């Protein structure tokens, strides 16, 4: 008997050849093929949970990496802001760019204390800012701060108000290599009082510089008085200003 061909095997399966119990007769080759397919399907199904688990782990790792990158970026921006503020403080206090943070913050605390003390000392004299009827000069040695290399002076000038008074004051301070830290000016009824807090380099100035500043301000007042008298002596009448005042030279050291 010749072996069945594949067409005959398929026909036998479809025709349903009966076997003693009325079942179907299926060839061994066909059953082997079906079992192979079933086995492959089972293997594929068992693979899917592992693949899904791997995807979940990958997503968790991606989220962790994204959170880490965000944290690093936030930390970088925070450090940039801190360094920017520190550089501004270095510029305000005239510190070297290499000054470390601890030294810089110590200088800031010291400067704040100095300003607080100056505020307390000057608050008592606020009522005396109003200009008087007498020309006055007052020059004080206001403080000695060796840490930042500057010596502080306080100068007060009361005289007739004129448009070029402030430029003349600035020119005097510039000629003496002094820098203005604070300035207050009050003008009432043609009279003005200027109170200046100035700083000078300790390598160029000492306590004796009080006299240099005082003499420069005295010269300024004398020029101002002379100019005022010349302007008030208009025409041929020679009438002098009724507001002419003598110079009371007050020096406090």
Swiss-Prot record:
Q: Does the keyword Transcription regulation apply?
A: yes
What keywords are annotated for this sequence in UniProt? DNA-binding, Nucleus, Transcription, Transcription regulation
Superkingdom field: Eukaryota
Question: Would you name any one GO CC term?
Answer: nucleus
Segments forming domain bHLH:
66-115
Any single GO BP term: regulation of DNA-templated transcription
Disulfide bond entries = none
Q: Where in the cell is it found?
A: Nucleus
Q: Which GO-annotated molecular functions does the record name?
A: DNA binding; DNA-binding transcription factor activity; protein dimerization activity
**Gene3D superfamilies reported in the protein's UniProt record:** Helix-loop-helix DNA-binding domain
InterPro entries reported in the protein's UniProt record:
AIG1-like, bHLH_dom, HLH_DNA-bd_sf
Q: Which PROSITE patterns match?
A: BHLH
What do we know about how this protein assembles, alone or with others? Answer: Homodimer.
Name of the protein in question: Transcription factor bHLH106
Native species of this protein? Answer: Arabidopsis thaliana
């Amino acid at each position: 008997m010749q072996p069945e061909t594949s067409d005959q095997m398929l026909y036998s399966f479809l025709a349903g050849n009966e076997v003693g119990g009325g079942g179907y007769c299926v060839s061994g080759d066909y059953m082997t093929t079906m079992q192979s397919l079933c086995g492959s399907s089972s293997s594929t199904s068992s693979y899917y949970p592992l693949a899904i688990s791997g995807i979940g782990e990958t997503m968790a790792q991606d989220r962790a990496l994204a959170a880490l990158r965000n944290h690093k970026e936030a930390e970088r921006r925070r450090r940039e802001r801190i360094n920017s503020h520190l550089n501004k403080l270095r510029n305000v206090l005239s510190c070297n760019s290499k000054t470390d943070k601890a030294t810089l913050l110590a200088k800031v605390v010291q400067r704040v204390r100095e300003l607080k003390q100056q505020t307390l000392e000057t608050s008592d004299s606020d009522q005396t800012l109003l200009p008087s009827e007498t020309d006055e000069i007052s020059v004080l040695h206001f403080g000695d701060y060796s840490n930042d290399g500057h010596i502080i002076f306080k100068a007060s000038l009361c005289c007739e108000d004129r448009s070029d008074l402030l430029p003349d004051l600035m020119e005097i301070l510039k000629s003496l290599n002094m820098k203005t830290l604070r300035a207050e000016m009050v003008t009432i009824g043609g009279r003005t009082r200027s109170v200046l807090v100035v700083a000078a380099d300790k390598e160029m100035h000492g306590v004796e510089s009080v006299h240099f500043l005082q003499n420069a301000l005295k010269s300024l007042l004398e020029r101002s008085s002379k100019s005022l008298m010349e302007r008030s002596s208009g025409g041929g009448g020679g009438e002098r200003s009724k507001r002419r005042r003598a110079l009371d030279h007050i020096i406090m050291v």
